Amino acid sequence: RAFLRADPDVIMIGEMRDKETADIAIEASLTGHLVFSTIHTNSAVETVVRLLDLGCDPFNFSDAMLGVLAMRLCKRICPNCREAYHPTRSEYDELVQAFGEGDWEGVHPAYNPGLTLFRGRGCDTCNQTGYRGRVPIHELMVVSDSMKALIQARARTGELLTLAKSDGMRTLVQDGIEKVLQGLTTYKQVRAVAIK
C-alpha cells in the first residue's frame, strides 16, 4: 500500500500468493497504475481461475486485467551439432494432433517428402546432449470485452480457453510446436514443459 502513496506509474509485485496481495494489485490497476506480477499456474487461462479462487471480486478483477502471459523455457537444440531429419508419419501426426488439427490446416505444410525437422546429434560443445541454452515458449491472453464478461460470470477454464483461442491466442503447446518447426527445439522438450 505504501507504493500507492508514492504515485508510481508502474508497480511490480513479486508474486501473488494470497487474496490481500491480489486485491492490492487490482486496486492499484483500477487507480491507473500499470501492475505486473507473477503467479504459478499451468497456463494463462488457469491464472484467471486461480485468482478468482483466491477470492478476488470478478468484476474489479476483469476491469483491472489487460492480459496474462504464460511462459516456459525449453532446451534449445545445440547450434553446433544441429542436424535436419525427415520425421516419420507418426511424429508428424503427433505434432498435428497436439497443435490442433483445425488450427494446423492451411497454416502448416501437409506431410511430404521435403518436410524437415531438427535434432541435436551431440557434440563436445553440448556435452553430447544435443542441447545448449534455452528457448522460451509463450502464451499471451489479451482480455477482450467478451473475456471480461466470461470472467465476471466465473466461466470454467474450458470456456475461457475457447474464447481466448477464438480471440487469437496461441497456446504454449502451439507456440512450442512453432519453435519445433523453426528448428529451435524438439517436440520432446515442448511436451516436457508444456503438456501436463
Where are these regions (language model features)?
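Short, flexible helix-loop junctions that flank or precede catalytic/ligand sites
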Residues: 1-196
